[in-house]
């Protein structure tokens, strides 16, 4: 880990899963919660906004990707005396580390999709034997796309819409 972090606390844990059984259990947990998200929690507007991305609660790629990287933020650390250690800016620190990881994966020719599986964190934390101070921030399936994979043609905002020069 070479990412900057608040007070150099490095408040992250990257869990790399390659075991087929664990990947399938992760898929089951994610799909169960995602179906509830799509049908009940998020509402019609959210579901309609996602239509152009052709996504739904079925996440076959969680079984087929060679690796799943689950990134946990450490809300606090543990000192040798058992007391809690403050992790300053833990979410933004871990988010920066994730951005660097995404750039490195792309540079290595690997593919992923960012996934923030809502309401799955506690079950995944237990499945992966993570401590209570860790909260799931991001799930990345990593590998190469299928030869017949299609990606929606998405355009990006022009630079002048996202940057102000003074």
Model regions and ranges:
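C-terminal helix-cap and adjacent tail motif
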Residues: 135-166
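Active-site-flanking beta-strand signature of metal-NTP-handling nucleotidyl enzymes
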Residues: 68-72
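N-terminal amphipathic, basic helical "cap/leader" segment at the start of enzyme domains
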Residues: 1-64, 166
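Generic beta-strand structural signal
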Residues: 65-67, 108, 136-138
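A generic local secondary-structure boundary/capping motif
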Residues: 57-60, 126-130, 153
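Small-aliphatic-rich amphipathic alpha-helix that forms the alpha element of a beta-alpha
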Residues: 75, 79-126
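Short, electropositive alpha-helical surface patch
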Residues: 122-137
């Amino acid at each position: 880990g070479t990412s900057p972090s608040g007070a150099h606390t490095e408040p992250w844990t990257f869990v790399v899963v390659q075991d087929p059984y664990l990947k399938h259990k992760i898929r089951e947990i994610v799909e169960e919660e995602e179906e509830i998200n799509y049908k009940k929690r998020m509402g019609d507007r959210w579901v309609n906004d996602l239509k152009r991305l052709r996504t739904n609660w079925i996440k076959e790629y969680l079984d087929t990707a060679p690796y799943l990287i689950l990134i946990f933020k450490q809300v606090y650390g543990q000192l040798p005396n058992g007391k809690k250690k403050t992790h300053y800016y833990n979410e933004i620190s871990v988010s920066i580390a994730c951005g660097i990881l995404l750039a490195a994966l792309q540079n290595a020719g690997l593919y992923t999709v960012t996934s923030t599986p809502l309401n799955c964190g506690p079950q995944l934390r237990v499945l992966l034997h993570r401590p209570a101070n860790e909260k799931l921030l991001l799930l990345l399936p990593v590998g190469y796309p299928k030869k017949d994979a299609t990606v929606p043609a998405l355009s990006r905002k022009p630079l002048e819409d996202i940057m102000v020069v003074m």
